[in-house]
From Swiss-Prot:
The modification Phosphothreonine is found at T528. Can form homodimers and heterodimers with IGF2BP1 and IGF2BP3. Component of the coding region determinant (CRD)-mediated complex, composed of DHX9, HNRNPU, IGF2BP1, SYNCRIP and YBX1. Identified in a mRNP complex, at least composed of DHX9, DDX3X, ELAVL1, HNRNPU, IGF2BP1, ILF3, PABPC1, PCBP2, PTBP2, STAU1, STAU2, SYNCRIP and YBX1. Associates with mRNP complex. Interacts with FMR1. Component of a multisubunit autoregulatory RNP complex (ARC), at least composed of IGF2BP1, PABPC1 and CSDE1. Interacts with AGO1 and AGO2. Phosphorylated at Ser-181 by mTORC2 cotranslationally, promoting binding to the 3'-UTR of IGF2 mRNA. The gene is Igf2bp1. It is found in: Nucleus; Cytoplasm; Cytoplasm, Perinuclear region; Cytoplasm, P-body. The keyword Cytoplasm applies. This is Insulin-like growth factor 2 mRNA-binding protein 1. RNA-binding factor that recruits target transcripts to cytoplasmic protein-RNA complexes (mRNPs). This transcript 'caging' into mRNPs allows mRNA transport and transient storage. It also modulates the rate and location at which target transcripts encounter the translational apparatus and shields them from endonuclease attacks or microRNA-mediated degradation. Preferentially binds to N6-methyladenosine (m6A)-containing mRNAs and increases their stability. Regulates localized beta-actin/ACTB mRNA translation, a crucial process for cell polarity, cell migration and neurite outgrowth. Keywords: Cell projection, Cytoplasm, mRNA transport, Nucleus, Phosphoprotein, Repeat, RNA-binding, Synapse, Translation regulation, Transport. Expressed in zygotes and blastocysts (at protein level). Expressed in brain, skeletal muscle, trophoblasts of placenta, oocytes and spermatogonia (at protein level). Expressed in testis and ovary. Following colon injury, expressed in the wound bed mesenchyme during the first phase of repair, probably by colonic mesenchymal stem cells (at protein level). GO terms for molecular function: mRNA 3'-UTR binding; mRNA 5'-UTR binding; mRNA binding; N6-methyladenosine-containing RNA reader activity; translation regulator activity. GO terms for cellular component: CRD-mediated mRNA stability complex; cytoplasmic stress granule; cytosol; dendritic spine; filopodium; growth cone; lamellipodium; neuronal cell body. The modification Phosphoserine is found at S12, S73, S181.
Amino acid sequence: MNKLYIGNLNESVTPADLEKVFAEHKISYSGQFLVKSGYAFVDCPDEHWAMKAIETFSGKVELQGKRLEIEHSVPKKQRSRKIQIRNIPPQLRWEVLDSLLAQYGTVENCEQVNTESETAVVNVTYSNREQTRQAIMKLNGHQLENHALKVSYIPDEQITQGPENGRRGGFGSRGQPRQGSPVAAGAPAKQQPVDIPLRLLVPTQYVGAIIGKEGATIRNITKQTQSKIDVHRKENAGAAEKAISVHSTPEGCSSACKMILEIMHKEAKDTKTADEVPLKILAHNNFVGRLIGKEGRNLKKVEQDTETKITISSLQDLTLYNPERTITVKGAIENCCRAEQEIMKKVREAYENDVAAMSLQSHLIPGLNLAAVGLFPASSSAVPPPPSSVTGAAPYSSFMQAPEQEMVQVFIPAQAVGAIIGKKGQHIKQLSRFASASIKIAPPETPDSKVRMVVITGPPEAQFKAQGRIYGKLKEENFFGPKEEVKLETHIRVPASAAGRVIGKGGKTVNELQNLTAAEVVVPRDQTPDENDQVIVKIIGHFYASQMAQRKIRDILAQVKQQHQKGQSNLAQARRK
């Protein structure tokens, strides 16, 4: 994506004119300007320079009385499903952007592009060409919090790539293993190692001291701690604080953290700029609830054990640019470093649990994109492939080639109904479109009911998206406290004849389910089956726990169904004999 289209040029513009304006704004380019009648093309050395040229010139710089319009040059055959949206307000919430994008079709992927501009940029992939065309037509120039969005195509490489060289490692266009590929055949899938970096927030005035003269100090830190350290100096220009990412083992991260903290304390003392320099750790919002613990118990224990004072930034600070919470630790250097070890231990545990749930979801729901759903850090590099086998799980292809419709009942606080519905029903409509599911809120059972039932009908991926957004909305709207994890009760219906299989002999299966998923799973005894001869299974837990339990129960039901069909087939064959 390094080739640029330069539009809105006067007929008299020459290559020399363009060379001059690029030089004046210090924008690098490679090769020659190819000037046509009213437009031109040029190559940039890399994607960074291409984005910088677009941000610098497009609609801002005049040449011979006309404002330049610059965007990625995309051949017609590659104008398919991918677009880039620029000039997004930096404080915009993901929820708002996702709702806007979902109005024009199914978003398969949405990822943020790192730029030096104050506004945000995202690359979006829709499910088909027509949806993309509608999005460009409606969103280009759309006003969002006093920012006019700029939308253009970016190359969709899959359109021109063949099946052999266009995709990675035996996977189809949406992530499914192709028939005959090693993963599809059940070969061992190699798990990537967990790499969740330690992210620190440091005052900008200390960044120079951390890097050192010609990078000597930071090289010394990386060498001693066997780590890779990225100082994000160019992001959020003018900000009072900068992020530093440390990639290493937990021990290496902690050693690097201590060295960086010591440098900041020394610099503060030498320059007399601060009496105290707290340790600030960045953690994705998805993990913070489990770090805090029920009623804040986990966090209180860390404070007591390490003799530190720990505070966490508000949920209200989360924006499109910033899905992370800031954990501020105050105390002596040694104590702060001990607190870092405990905090990151909790964060890594939460991450590993989510990766396990994510692996199961990607195994059972091919094509599921958790970053696009907005439930898993898009920055996480360690996204494992689907597991080659999951205990008790039948291969997806064997029983769900056409995903079956599932009906799930989720119980939410009664006072949250308005937030889920939204003004004039807008939010629930957008949620339904986004998830491709039917979402209805049942009337209250009694006038003073404290909970309301949300009925979601759709295939597994739709269930995942819809339920995830409901959990997220309840947290965002503060229906659960800042130190409280969102745990909801969910009901799924199973055939009465299969309830015993869910429970297992002596409750063995249901106990294993609870241990595996961390959700509470209850099959109420003495239930009267409904008109469809089904009974209720109750699941209580946070989002990933609930999802994992739901999928495992569906596995059990699928196996029961398979065995029943096999038995019927054998019986029919015996009769024919």
